[in-house]
Amino acid sequence: EEAAKKAEIRQTNKKAYVNESPFYSVLETQKNNLVTTRANTSYVYTPNLTKVSVEVRTYNDIPDDVKTFESYFEGLFPNCRKISGASSIYNCHSYAWHLSAWNNPYWMPDPRDYWGDGSYVKYNPGSYFQASTRAVFKIGSSNNADNWHSVLIRKAYTGTTKYVVAESKWGPYGLYEHYLLDNPWAVNSSWVTH
């Protein structure tokens, strides 16, 4: 019931929802460049050799309050397991699509070339989820990658989405192992698998 109430607030009044939800408050702060990191532009390539722009961040700029929020999020998602701590060096898109390692050196603003060039094909998993596939959560109808979250499915699973094991990097926060739909972006979003 509380989740439905928050979803309704988010749909009708984004500002009220941001004020109601610490997670989205921090994301809004990050989007408004109040959490900043110096970066240089570089490129990585999809399996079909399309050039993708990435940022090589020269400083891991994690304010103390971000670490406090990370602890708060872990309380909201108790079934998640932290793999590594907060880092503004890499993000969920880079982790899921380019290099699945905690020491990944790239922040990828937009992953859509990975499926746009045919390197990964959208599929409907039905009741079978393949290991090493990816899911992209899109909040609302936005085509802006700032509102997307990429997840790497780690273990093959037959059944409902409830127990599909995935990993993802949560913005500038930690890298987590979690069930596919047990992440902050899964609420009130649509998702596709590749």
Positions of PLM-derived features:
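...with weaker cross-activation on analogous glycine-rich loops/strands in unrelated enzymes
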Residues: M108-G174
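Mature extracellular/secreted ectodomains of secretory-pathway proteins
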Residues: E1-V18
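A recurrent domain-boundary module in secreted/ectodomain proteins
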Residues: N13, N19-K31, H194
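Glycine- and charge-enriched low-complexity intrinsically disordered segments
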Residues: G171-H194
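N-terminal capping segments
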Residues: Y24-D113
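A structural signal for short, hydrophobic beta-strand segments that form beta-sheets
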Residues: A86, Y90, I153-A156, V187-N188
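Positively charged, low-complexity intrinsically disordered regions
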Residues: Q11-T12, A39, A135
